[in-house]
Amino acid sequence: MMTSKRILVADDSDTSRGVLAKFVAQRDFDVCEAVDGEDTIEKARKLKPDLILLDVAMPHTNGIVAASVLKDLLPNVRIVLFTMYTEAIARAFPRTGLAADAVISKGDGMEKLEECVQSLLR
């Protein structure tokens, strides 16, 4: 029997986090949630997820910093920045220097997110 992949959903918005967690759970992934960057790092350390859906604009530790820390802690974890700030991220972080496997705009919708998640977890 194949164990389901674990996805950590990190967003400081209860609404966004809830929608993402439900979306992930409906696709038979094991889902856990984090409310900010520090919580994400702590939970990732304990739970060792296969993939982290990470908002960028979060309190305490933002998603960019958290992604870098997470890649150091868990080099094999896949990280998707799911954010409204894709253009700013593209300008600020050329292809090198961003510790995320993908950046998806919240405006692109769930279909694109699902394609990205499925691709990264193959």
Language-model segments: which ranges?
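Active-site beta3 strand of CheY-like receiver
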Residues: 47-53
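Two-component/phosphorelay signaling modules centered on CheY-like receiver
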Residues: 14-32
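Alpha4 helix (beta4-alpha4-beta5 surface) of REC/receiver domains from two-component response regulators
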Residues: 65, 86-115
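Non-catalytic signal-transmission and effector/linker regions of two-component phosphorelay proteins
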Residues: 1-6, 110-122
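Receiver (REC) domain active-site loop signature in two-component systems and cognate sites
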Residues: 58
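Acidic catalytic/metal-coordinating carboxylates
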Residues: 36-39, 62-66
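Conserved sequence signature across two-component system core domains
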Residues: 10-11, 34, 52
